[in-house]
């Protein structure tokens, strides 16, 4: 079956009595150009700087000051974020281990296998999981796991994959990304992540300080990854057609914060979570007696949050999720 043929995808669903589940985000990608864009973005070797950003410390005091002006964020304006942003043309060695969450009918899975990847695909729908095994049966380079990806992430099944490529389900996509990335510092998270998500989610992930759409997810992701919006994908490229458009997003580990200890990471999570829960408040009001600042959460860069986390020290660890 040609998985980029709308008529063939529809015929398979009809003949098998399969009805795409909106709750599970079963909107199947049926556009060859969009598919190739995802695969091309995924199989470019990341350019990782060997330099790392030291954890910034300030004098130990009960109240730490932050200016309203922020230093430039790694995932901000220096990275292309428009639909026509060119990707570097690079010949590279293909990664051997690739994680895919929510493969659906297997259009991405098939493309990854064709390009030489060894794929572990996690599919929640048992009908689609069985179909994937039958249609793309490749015991040497394809493993299909049935169940909830969040459970597999928590039990460590998803650790150790250098590459993750997924058309993430709309309702759970952000949570899946955060759960994967939060394992950095304790376990091995992917060096490169290429995902297809709602455009509004993509914009939040890539937003730099000062942006109205900057939020907790973007700050969390940018702590360890540079973010690039590769291109937009119209709703017409899916069947069934979703209500809104999507975007291909590429995340590459920058390793600048690798020397941030577990306490700093936990404090960072606690600070940012609490700050964005009260995003319209000035930080001085949210953290009375701890931080002196008239800035609001979205106005701080990741470097600012890192400096605060290192200066404040371990606290709030039980609440950082």
Describe the predicted segments one by one.
Residues 272-321:
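C-terminal lobe and adjacent flexible extensions of AdoMet/dcAdoMet transferase-like proteins
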């Amino acid at each position: 079956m040609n998985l980029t043929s709308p008529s063939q995808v529809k015929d398979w669903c009809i003949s098998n009595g399969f009805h795409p589940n909106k709750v599970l985000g079963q909107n199947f990608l049926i556009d060859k150009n969009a598919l190739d864009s995802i695969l091309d973005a995924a199989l470019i070797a990341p350019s990782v700087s060997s330099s790392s950003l030291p954890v910034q410390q300030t004098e130990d005091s009960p109240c730490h000051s932050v200016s309203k002006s922020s230093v430039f964020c790694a995932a901000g304006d220096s990275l292309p974020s428009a639909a026509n942003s060119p990707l570097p043309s690079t010949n590279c060695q293909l990664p051997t281990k690739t994680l895919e969450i929510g493969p659906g009918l297997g259009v991405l899975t098939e493309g990854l296998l064709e390009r030489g990847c060894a794929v572990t695909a996690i599919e929640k729908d048992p009908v689609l999981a069985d179909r994937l095994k039958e249609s793309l049966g490749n015991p040497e380079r394809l493993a299909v796991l049935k169940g909830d990806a969040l459970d597999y992430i928590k039990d460590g099944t998803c650790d150790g994959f250098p590459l993750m490529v997924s058309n993430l389900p709309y309702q759970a996509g952000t949570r899946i990304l955060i759960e994967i990335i939060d394992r950095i510092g304790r376990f091995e998270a992917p060096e490169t992540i290429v995902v297809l998500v709602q455009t509004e989610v993509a914009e939040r992930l890539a937003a730099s300080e000062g942006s109205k759409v900057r939020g907790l997810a973007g700050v969390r992701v940018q702590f360890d990854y540079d973010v690039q919006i590769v291109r937009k994908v119209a709703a017409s490229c899916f069947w069934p057609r979703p209500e809104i458009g999507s975007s291909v997003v590429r995340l590459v580990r920058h390793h600048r914060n690798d020397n941030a200890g577990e306490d700093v990471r936990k404090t960072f999570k606690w600070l940012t979570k609490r700050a964005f829960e009260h995003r319209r408040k000035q930080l001085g009001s949210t953290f009375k007696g701890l931080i002196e600042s008239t800035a609001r959460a979205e106005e701080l860069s990741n470097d600012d949050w890192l400096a605060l986390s290192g200066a404040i020290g371990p606290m709030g660890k039980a609440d950082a999720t």
